């Protein structure tokens, strides 16, 4: 039920020599509920625990695994630790580790400006001291009215700790330093390491002197001076590190405007949505990695074509632009240009950064300042143009498929001449439906309303016809209600007011 219980249970688990013992707290578990990809991976969670402990055993067969897990469960229950002990194998166990791995990105989903910040996330102590250390850690945070995210390597005494602080405020900025100083002293008390897994760098380099002592720190300085007297290689990371709060992304107290957007961003504004990107780089996948995100990066292998780059450039200009219309920057347009609006990031990005939505919103404001390109108007009016073509579909299809006229149309419209243009079906779905005779079985089981978008109506009409016939044979009467166009063409080109 609590983090403390999980850490005490961890000590029991370690006696059985697991291959891994990892902590995931309730903050991350709550974030998984709002993430489409990770919501599927939390199937084993029962109730709303304060934390879960994921223990992995690798043995020769399942019988041996079961014998160990039965002993671990019995010992934990005997001392009142834990209430649900699912044992998972194979593909199901992979889902747990996928959820655990996504923890860092999921933390960006916390609503508002207060975020889980990596100020002291790498502390490590002797695993037997871990429960007491975390209790002391949380007492310090409680004193300052703060809470923290806890996750990761319980089995090795190295829990990632991220206090939730609003770095955009002067108060939050001051707390950032205060927490770093007080936790560094606490780690020293437990003879631990302030950077148990990753480097010290600009964030924790300031505290190396305190961690290793004056004599050892001087040895580090002498070593640096001997082999790199000009401080060429990675300067100011281990020795002579500047104060940890002098190079922050946000200027404390800096005011950002209230953005009037056409889309609604749930519990946040557009800047806060862009700020959800924490730079984890899940969008830098190749086609061999599986998944969709991000197709433009898979093709170009250029950082500017990643989900991360698009979120970052929008965040930068919305925060620091001097223009009244902060979207009016060619640099943003160039980075957004190759986004396919495939929505892969909406489900696969652990931080749920929806670049397709961000791009559409950006384009509308950019067009407000710079006008709408002819090609975008053409695509936006796809339904109207298809309606005109549907009056004489055979003539339309001849024009777009003929090498001369088709090439001319593409050049005028601004399409690549190698691309094929969509053709029209011989009739529209709505016209066919109006004249067709319903199946004798239709209506025996009820009624279905079929919403016919412009693409099904004009292009993929056979799919619509097959759907109607199938539903009627299954016993449903079908009705196609009058409704507006889907607006997808307008939205895809950023003309969201029309969409």
Give the ranges of each region predicted by the language model.
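Active-site-adjacent "gating/activation" loops or surface patches in catalytic cores
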Residues: 143-146, 159, 309-312, 440-449
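Ferredoxin-type iron-sulfur electron-transfer modules in oxidoreductases and energy-metabolism complexes
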Residues: 246, 250-389
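Iron-sulfur-cluster electron-transfer modules
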Residues: 110-114, 323-499
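Secondary-structure capping and boundary motifs in well-ordered enzyme cores
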Residues: 129, 150-157, 172-175, 179, ...
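Hydrophobic alpha-helix feature that most strongly marks membrane-spanning transmembrane helices
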Residues: 14, 18, 77, 142, ...
């Amino acid at each position: 039920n609590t983090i403390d219980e999980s850490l005490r249970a961890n000590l029991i688990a370690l006696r059985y020599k697991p291959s891994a013992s990892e902590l995931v707290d309730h903050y991350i578990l709550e974030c998984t509920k709002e993430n489409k990809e990770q919501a599927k991976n939390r199937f084993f969670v029962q109730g709303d625990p304060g934390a879960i402990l994921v223990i992995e055993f690798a043995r020769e067969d399942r019988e041996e695994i079961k014998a160990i897990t039965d002993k671990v469960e019995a010992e934990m229950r005997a001392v009142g630790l834990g209430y649900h002990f699912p044992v998972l194998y194979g593909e199901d166990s992979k889902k747990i580790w996928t959820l655990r791995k996504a923890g860092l990105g999921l933390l960006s989903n916390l609503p508002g400006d207060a975020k889980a910040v990596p100020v002291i996330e790498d502390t490590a102590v002797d695993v037997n001291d871990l429960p007491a250390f975390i209790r002391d850690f949380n007492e310090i945070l409680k004193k300052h009215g703060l809470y923290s995210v806890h996750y990761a390597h319980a089995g090795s005494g190295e829990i990632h700790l991220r206090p939730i602080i609003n770095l955009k405020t002067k108060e939050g900025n001051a707390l950032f330093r205060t927490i770093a100083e007080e936790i560094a002293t606490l780690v020293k008390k437990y003879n631990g390491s302030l950077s148990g897994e990753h480097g010290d760098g600009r964030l924790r380099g300031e505290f190396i002197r305190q961690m290793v002592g004056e004599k050892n720190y001087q040895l580090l300085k002498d070593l640096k001076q001997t082999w790199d007297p000009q401080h060429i290689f990675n300067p100011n990371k281990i020795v002579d590190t500047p104060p940890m709060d002098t190079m922050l992304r946000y200027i404390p107290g800096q005011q950002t405007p209230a953005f009037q957007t056409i889309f609604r961003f749930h519990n946040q504004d557009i800047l806060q949505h862009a700020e959800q990107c924490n730079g984890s780089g899940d969008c830098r996948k190749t086609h061999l990695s599986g998944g969709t995100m991000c197709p433009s990066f898979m093709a170009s292998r250029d950082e500017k074509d990643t989900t991360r780059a698009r979120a970052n450039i929008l965040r930068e200009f919305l925060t620091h632009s001097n223009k009244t219309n902060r979207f009016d920057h060619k640099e943003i347009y160039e980075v957004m240009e190759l986004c396919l609006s495939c929505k892969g990031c909406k489900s696969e990005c652990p931080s749920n950064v929806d670049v397709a939505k961000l791009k559409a919103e950006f384009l509308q404001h950019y067009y407000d300042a710079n006008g709408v390109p002819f090609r975008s108007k053409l695509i936006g009016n796809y339904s109207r143009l298809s309606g005109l073509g549907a009056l004489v579909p055979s003539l339309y299809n001849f024009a777009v498929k003929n090498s001369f006229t088709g090439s001319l149309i593409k050049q005028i419209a601004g399409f690549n001449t190698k691309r094929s243009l969509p053709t029209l079906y011989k009739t529209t779905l709505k016209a066919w439906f109006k004249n067709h005779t319903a199946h004798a079985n239709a209506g025996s089981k009820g009624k279905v309303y079929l919403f016919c978008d412009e693409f099904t109506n004009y292009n993929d009409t056979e799919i619509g016809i097959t759907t109607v016939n199938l539903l009627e044979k299954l016993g449903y009467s079908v009705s196609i209600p009058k409704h507006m166009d889907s607006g997808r063409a307008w939205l895809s080109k950023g003309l969201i007011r029309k969409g």
